[in-house]
Amino acid sequence: MAKIKVKSAKEIELIRDAGALAAETLILAGEMVKPGVSTLEIDEFIGDYTRKHKGISACMGYHGYPRYACISINEVVCHGIPRADTILKDGDIVNIDITTILSGYHGDTSAMFVAGKASALAQELIDTAKFCMEEGIHAAGEPRARFCDIGCAIQDIADEHGFSVVEDYCGHGIGRGFHEEPTVLHFRNSERTPFIEVGNVFTVEPMINVGKPGTKTLNDGWTAVTRDGSLSAQWEHTIVRTKDGVEILTLPR
């Protein structure tokens, strides 16, 4: 693993500003999740709102990605491309993933929303995925925590509920760069990773599947789906390790 950056107080404040805008945008975008709405409508709102508040949507153009945000429905694990012909239906579970650049620094967050009413299984998945993220964040704030402890905490919760943890995608350091060191694995693994240091800033963003953990990428080169067609859910925050534990940097002001 390459050297993990320790951010200064000023850098953390700038990431917090970007994270707050991302969080505020996410809340408003989530209010648009209703049957009959296209994912493109939601995405256009995200782009417009971000620009209005002097931010930049980091996804647009990143390695050729064509939209402002990733909007992933049901069996889509991540990187769902918003489209005019993708119309939300009653019972759809929807992840909206927003990364905002403000003053040169990134804030990255995502959350789950439901169009109409979710099935009991879908709601359990959504709630479990959120708990997985929360427990991963909690593990990162424990004394002498290592990065591998995050994945162990997440895996324990998923196993308890009979769900699986996606291994093909992971969390990451963040700051001036969208994706920096370290790579944050969300599953239990044997790698003896470094201790988490005060000033390390990174995302915790587990993707939890009802079925098996395997994924595949569709022909558009971006959209990742579960191999077995089962539902998937994800929540994400950007956090910083502090002397007292951790602070979530992607909260609304």
Question: Model segments located where?
Answer:
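Active-site neighborhoods and metal-handling regions in enzymes and metal-associated proteins
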Residues: 1-253
